[in-house]
Each structure stands twice: as C-alpha cells, then as structure tokens.
C-alpha cells in the first residue's frame, strides 16, 4: 500500500464525535492525529448544527499540549433543521464566533430525503421553480460579508448550479460543490465539466469515492 505524506495537508470536511452516529475520532483525537502527521488545517463538520466552539477548544488544547504547532482547527455550520434551516440569525452568530464554512442542508436537504425514500417536503427548500428561495439572499449576504466558504452539501446537481449562479451574482467568492460523485448528490461527468468550466471548486471525499466505486453507475456517461 502506498503511503502519502500528509505534511501541510488541509481537509475541509471531517466528521468527529460527539455525533448521532459513531465517528472514527473525537475532536481532540483528531487534533492529536493532525499534529502528528503535520497537517496544516482541518474543518470539522456536523449535520446537527455548528462546530466553531469545538474548534476553539481544539486550538486551545493544541497550544497547551503540543505547543505552537502549525495547525489550526476550523469550525462550520450546517443549515439543517437543528439550526432552523436557512436561518440568518443562527448563521450570523456562527460566523461571529468564527465559523469558516457554511454548508447548505445535508441530511435535511430535499434531495437527500428523496434519495432515502423520505418525503422531500419535510426538508429545507433552497430552490423553487428554477430560482433560489428568498431566504437564500440573506444567507449569501452573510457568507459574503464574513468571506466564508459556501458548500452545496447534499442538494441536487440542478439545485447546485442554480445556487452557485445566484451566489456568484450576489458576490459570494468561495463556492465548493460538495462530494459531487456521491450517489446522493450524483453529479454527472458533464456536470463536473461544467463546474470546472465555471471555476467552481469541487470537493472529493475518500469515503464517497470508495462507496461510489462499489455501486453500479448511476447515469454517468
């Protein structure tokens, strides 16, 4: 098995404990592992809300235990039902407390619910009739004002392009298409080409690539 050096690596999408499902590491274990391999930064993510307060404690722990190591843990917010969905008040607090990444709905995205055989009407709506819902304008403004990263999370490819076009028009500079190869998102190769053509960043997760490779192709050319 090949071993790849991890020094200087930045991972913007890591789930840790505590969580509603068991993860491989808790926050402090991840901090120790990151410092050990010389990682530069990690963004911790949760489907249940925010992690910027946890990231703050990780950085305090790192300084006390490891000294002035060149590693920073960053926090984020996911706009699922626990924070009120597209809730600008919750988002602004998270950004003021240091959240650097804003994910659109994940487990509560309408696309996610539909893919798991649940009622999409129970989800958080981000587009309607080919346009963003009005609440998204406040989300874009806050992301722009705080120069945060906006991730498309578990919304559909069609929704992603609508959202990204509108976000760009609103002045959002940092846009990431989240694990587009994962079967829940299921962006086609042509969709990925379009993303690259519009200079959108795409995030590819090891777990999603492994999971997708074990599945039958889902409409990809």
Language model segments and positions:
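Short, acidic/polar
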Residues: 22-33, 84-94, 188, 220
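Active-site-adjacent C-terminal substructures of enzyme catalytic domains
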Residues: 102, 135, 142, 150, ...
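Short secondary-structure boundary/capping elements
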Residues: 22-26, 50, 86, 131-135, ...
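Active-site environment of divalent metal-dependent phosphoester hydrolases
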Residues: 17-19, 49-53, 80-83, 109-112, ...
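Acidic (Asp/Glu)-rich catalytic clusters
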Residues: 55-70, 92-98, 141-144, 167-168, ...
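Divalent metal-dependent hydrolysis catalytic cores, especially in the metallo-beta-lactamase
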Residues: 11, 15-17, 29-53, 70-81, ...
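Extended substrate/RNA-proximal surfaces in nucleic-acid metabolism proteins
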Residues: 70, 80-178
């Amino acid at each position: 098995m090949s071993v790849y050096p991890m020094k200087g690596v930045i991972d913007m999408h890591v789930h840790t404990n505590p969580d509603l499902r068991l993860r491989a590491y808790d926050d402090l274990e991840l901090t120790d592992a990151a410092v050990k391999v010389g990682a530069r930064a990690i963004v911790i993510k949760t489907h249940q809300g925010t992690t910027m307060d946890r990231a703050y404690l990780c950085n305090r722990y790192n300084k006390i235990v490891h000294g002035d190591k060149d590693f920073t843990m960053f926090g984020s917010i996911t706009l699922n039902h626990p924070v009120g969905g597209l809730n600008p008040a919750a988002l602004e607090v998270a950004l003021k407390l240091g959240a650097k990444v804003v994910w659109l709905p994940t487990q509560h995205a309408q696309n996610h619910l539909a893919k798991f055989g649940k009622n999409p009407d129970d989800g958080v709506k981000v587009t309607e009739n080919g346009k963003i819902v009005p609440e998204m304008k406040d989300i874009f403004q806050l992301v722009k004002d705080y120069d945060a990263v906006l991730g498309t999370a578990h919304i559909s490819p069609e929704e992603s392009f609508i959202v990204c076009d509108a976000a760009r028009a609103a002045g959002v500079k940092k846009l990431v298409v989240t694990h587009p190869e994962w079967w829940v998102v299921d962006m086609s190769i042509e969709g990925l080409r379009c993303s690259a053509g519009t200079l959108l960043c795409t995030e590819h997760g090891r777990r999603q690539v492994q999971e997708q490779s074990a599945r039958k192709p889902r409409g990809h050319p």
